[in-house]
Each structure stands twice: as C-alpha cells, then as structure tokens.
C-alpha cells in the first residue's frame, strides 16, 4: 500500500521487453467474507491520508448510471487510471466475483499494457473481493495482479470486542508514518546506483526496498522483526491454488488416484481432469461458465 504512489516510477526502471508487466498495477485482497478486508482498506486509506471518509466506496457505488452500469463502471476506472495525472491509489471495496471473468480481465490487461506508453504515471488500483480461485486465472492475468489472501474470519462470538478494537486502532492512526516513508523511498528512487532487479520466486521483487525501509523502522523502534514479516515477495496466488486443490480433495476424494512416485519419496495423487466436468452445466444466464477442468488446469 505504501509503495503504491511509486509503482509507475518503479515500472520505468524496467525498459527491456515487457518486464514492467511483472510489476502489477492491480493489488487484490481476496478471501472469505467476514475476514476484515473492508476494515483493513479503511485503515490503510486513513494511513495514506487520501480522504476524510471512513468508508471506501464499493464497486457498485463508483457510478450512478443505472443503464449498462457495469460497462460504465469499467469505463470510469479506465479513465481514472489512464487519463488523469494522478499517483494516489484508487481504493475500491467489494469487487464482484464475476469481475475477473471476461470484460474485467480484459480491463486489467488493457490498462496494464497501455500504462507502459503513457506520458504521465498511472495510479495503482487496490481492491477487495470475495471471489475465489483468482490465483488460478490465466497466466496473463495472474502476471498483472498482486494477490493477497486474507482468509481468517473473525470469531462471530466476539464481534463486539473486535469492533471495539477496530475503532480503537482506527482513531489512533494517522498519515505520519506514510509521509516519512514517502521521503525515504523518494531518496532511494534518486540513487542511480541502486539495483531494482531483485527477484523472488522467478518474479521481480518490486517491494524489496519497501521491506528494507520497514526494517529500518523496526531498528529505530528497537523491536525485533516479527515472524510474520515477509523476507521475500509474497505469493498468495500459489497458496490459494493449493487451498483449491485441498478443498477439492476433501470434498471429492473419489476423483483422485494415489500412485507411487517414480522419483519422489512420497506418493502422488493423479486426477482425470475430464471427471471434474461430469456434473457441470453451463448456465444461459450465469456470468461464469468456465468448466471446472479449465479452472484447475490453469
């Protein structure tokens, strides 16, 4: 989030081929409902000092047009990102699950590609969604998004307590830390001898210097790095894919055949992908008619 105003400048550091596409403009916080994604976005909004509102607009609230609203919303997002000279991130809550199929996927690809040829910098788009299986989307889409999985639901029995804690945190925070971060990161951008091509898991680690700055904050506060502090680029898309297969095995173990691995020391599980489509029926009215075999194979 703190790095979002600098994404355009970081992308300019990569001029060979289409390297810039490995630095996504779209950050997606996904996961199950009730896990606090919207509250997280509201807190980050206040930390960045973007607006005085205490609620981020949802996707359905971006435009008032009642006719062809979905199309008008996509056009508005395109305009904000490609036509306005702005580096403040666009924060949007509750993207619908079907956004990442068809037109929404095309929007992400088009904006990511066109941003390379823009005269001015392109802002980042940060959103939340309850959509599942985003990590299993096409490689072209996965490359253009930064997916963070937030699947820990709050205990409904402690709703009052968690609400009080949220209000307590929200009222205390301000944009002071972000303003300091902007100064520190700007200095790094002005250093000609810095190597920006750090890699993590065969992907460009565009958040490398962000983590370095936050390490400085922990040193200043004389606090050890917590166990949850990431030491490399987070890849929740891979984690999400593993969860998908785990859920499939738990729900339909009969689809899998356990065989002994030829080189591995442990057994492996095989599945006939066509069996996934056995009970699949395409809906004339549904927006997602992707066969299960395609979802899992990707």
Describe each region flagged by the PLM.
Residues 1-55:
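P-loop NTPase catalytic core of nucleic-acid-dependent motor ATPases
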Residues 13-17, 74-81, 113-116, 133-136:
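Generic recognition of flexible, low-complexity loop/linker segments
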Residues 33-36, 95-101, 131-135, 154-155:
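Short acidic, S/G/P-rich loop/turn micro-motifs used as interaction or catalytic elements
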Residues 44-47, 104-109, 137-146:
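Short secondary-structure boundary/capping segments
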Residues 97-122:
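Conserved catalytic/switch belt of AAA+ P-loop NTPases
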